Amino acid sequence: MHMPPAVSPQEWKAAREELLVEEKELTHARDALAAKRRRMPRMAVEKDDVFEGPNGPASLVDLFEGRRQLIVYRFFFEPGVHGWPDGGCPGCSWIADQITHPAHLNARDTTIALISRAPQTDIGRWKARMGWEILPWYTLTDDFDTDFDVGEWHGTNVFYRDDDDRIFRTYFVDGRGDEALGGTWAYLDITALGRQEDWEDTPEGYPQSPANVWLRRHDEYDAPAGSEAAEAMAVQVERGRAAGQTKSSGS
């Protein structure tokens, strides 16, 4: 294997700074693309789809769990899929392993859920084996998958629910588009409301708050504003900014 040359610390830093210019350009281009997603037209969902959940039948509205946004990943775990009934699709399983702790998305009024055609008894067993108990997972009972382009291949749909419980499809990605997902930021960037931070280019009236100060450990999101957890995060953010952390490619 032919590796790049070994260089001095000064040469390495110069090469790093040169690459950083392109990385920042990519970050800004990614931000601009997310801003365009937030301005995409929305498609009304007219059909009343029914799923089976761990507690019985569930509507698409139920999958939101009372939140404003819903991300749905089509996981192939059902008859005809390699490994059935002992396991789900290896590729889908790999993606599921990347999914962020749902509490971080929930804190941004967003729910994530998986859907398959496997019965709930098999889903429960499979979740326990893989350590995915915290992920909501529903059984398909109708044509929801084919209606939303995930009948034959994995993919991620995003929906928005308004104050009257009307549902709109706001985004869809499949194939290699799913590769970039898994982390909280990546998921929020494909939603209609985005990260909901005040630096974003977002349509007027969308919810926004100062960047990063809403972040918590995943079991501390119930801490109210002004609590020790909230104040600690605000202090940490300011300390990081003062130390020049914005020099990274994420700025």
Residues of each region from the PLM?
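Non-globular targeting/processing and membrane-anchoring segments
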Residues: 1-108, 128-129, 142-251
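Conserved segment of the thioredoxin-like fold in thiol-based oxidoreductases
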Residues: 111-139
